[in-house]
Amino acid sequence: MKIINIGVLAHVDAGKTTLTESLLYNSGAITELGSVDKGTTRTDNTLLERQRGITIQTGITSFQWENTKVNIIDTPGHMDFLAEVYRSLSVLDGAILLISAKDFVQAQTRILFHALRKMGIPTIFFINKIDQNGIDLSTVYQDIKEKLSAEIVIKQKVELYPNMCVTNFTESEQWDTVIEGNDDLLEKYMSGKSLEALELEQEESIRFQNCSLFPLYHGSAKSNIGIDNLIEVITNKFYSSTHRGPSELCGNVFKIEYTKKRQRLAYIRLYSGVLHLRDSVRVSEKEKIKVTEMYTSINGELCKIDRAYSGEIVILQNEFLKLNSVLGDTKLLPQRKKIENPHPLLQTTVEPSKPEQREMLLDALLEISDSDPLLRYYVDSTTHEIILSFLGKVQMEVISALLQEKYHVEIELKEPTVIYMERPLKNAEYTIHIEVPPNPFWASIGLSVSPLPLGSGMQYESSVSLGYLNQSFQNAVMEGIRYGCEQGLYGWNVTDCKICFKYGLYYSPVSTPADFRMLTPIVLEQAFRKAGTELLEPYLSFKVYAPQEYLSRAYNDAPKYCANIVNTQLKNNEVIIIGEIPARCIQDYRNDLTFFTNGLSVCLAELKGYQVTTGEPVCQTRRLNSRIDKVRYMFNKIT
């Protein structure tokens, strides 16, 4: 049986969950349509998703049509959940990008389409909600051509009378775009030679698989218009990116989920081989796991199975598998272009409304961060506060609601702040000698620090030979440096810095690696104090798409938000403004753009890197370490 995995992607409220229900219903996988409004859909399966009417976590279901099994990945539609989208993209054989006939191309549609093209995933456009009043499809087509791609092939026409339906175009009506994109076919056509349908179909298929051509279909998921035709298209146009024939096992973990009973489930896409119940499987070329329970989606329901074949999505109950773990032969994993996950830029302090629920909160955050690596947390050793870092405010609102719904923990959040970093201002060295007060450790250490260009990251080298200071002591120094770089003079992580271990001395047999591990961060801090540090803040590169008449306002307002305009372009009826902006200002700039363009602007942004801050220095409370802080205090007093 052929197995294909497709993604359903769209902006918020474009109807992707409703479309999934219609595909299941029309294929016979379910006997009754679920409703987003009533909270009875198969993929939006949490109360939070049903209440908000949006998809938050990747949902998986399936149907079978003739000799093809289709696994449907119903992905989130809000930019704060892009990490969930990106993880699911890597397992897809193709995608359906929904566009609401009422709302046209939205900001999120552009982001998702950019990701699909970058990863090389064949994509079909599906214009949904064509049965709503006042729909002008020609305007929708033009919007798609201007904002997504002009290389679309409109495969159907919409019949309004006697009943609304969609019918396939004849061959002559749909081949213009295919011919225009191939010089040989165009020359043949212009010379009056006849073109065979087979060669046109082959050209369309090649360009579709190469993501340079996008077939376009219509329908209404809610009214069940065009769904049968879409099922035929899905099963015939998409190909499975799996290894055929006998081969070693290869699979990739793309989702971690916890059940209500706290069972930990790992979702795996198989790319080759066969996975059997009770198999012992090597994970990421390291340890082995034993398959004790295995599930897959069959006609919209999770069912236990005893074997799974290449192309399938399986679910294992396992405590050790992590996101992106590879089962079996890592060499068989398809090499797809990667998209950088959004980087957490905000952090806040969270505490339970009821102090007695603190342990419950920490246990819940451990599970949530295991499923979503973009949510990170730690407990401040000084204040004992729980610090969360995350992507956006909507993500934080959802996590707050999730904690209340699933874990029964209400929380209170402080106003979020941007996550900063630090860099040394100049070269500096510092040495602390053994048996010289106030050094209580049986170790001598000398370190130098040097600033590096922005974006260089951390570099480390040792000029102390292993013959003079053995590996265990040197490893302890590196561990101490990693710890010391977690807090610069302002309390933020240090980056763009070269650290050199220049001098070390030990006394045998009393010196231990722990002496070097404890002394290193103290030496490093003193070196930073001599060098001084500057505060770095995250900068975003952005693109603003807006109607041409708003160019002057958008351009002139940029300096108010510390934005630097790099370039402006005119395309069709839009102006494109390209620039850089501090992360702390992006939300205010977006809100301003939305206000004065009456919601007609789109602002796309991604992390560019860290630059020297233009705002006031922001300090973060240092985390305490009872074993070294007294010594730190003594050295700070004498320097």
Swiss-Prot record:
It comes from the Bacteria. One of its GO terms (biological process) is translation. Residues 1-242 form the tr-type G domain. GO terms for molecular function: GTP binding; GTPase activity. InterPro entries: EF-G-like_DII (IPR053905), EFG_II (IPR041095), EFG_III/V (IPR035647), EFG_V-like (IPR000640), G_TR_CS (IPR031157), P-loop_NTPase (IPR027417), Ribosomal_Su5_D2-typ_SF (IPR020568), Ribsml_uS5_D2-typ_fold_subgr (IPR014721). SMART domains: EFG_IV. GTP binds at residues 10-17, 74-78, 128-131. CDD domains: Tet_C, Tet_II, Tet_III, Tet_like_IV, TetM_like. Keywords: Antibiotic resistance, GTP-binding, Nucleotide-binding, Protein biosynthesis. NCBIfam families: small_GTP, tet_protect, tet_protect_M, tet_protect_M_W. Abolishes the inhibitory effect of tetracyclin on protein synthesis by a non-covalent modification of the ribosomes. Belongs to the TRAFAC class translation factor GTPase superfamily. Classic translation factor GTPase family. TetM/TetO subfamily. This is Tetracycline resistance protein TetM. It comes from Staphylococcus aureus. The lineage of its organism: Bacteria, Bacillati, Bacillota, Bacilli, Bacillales.
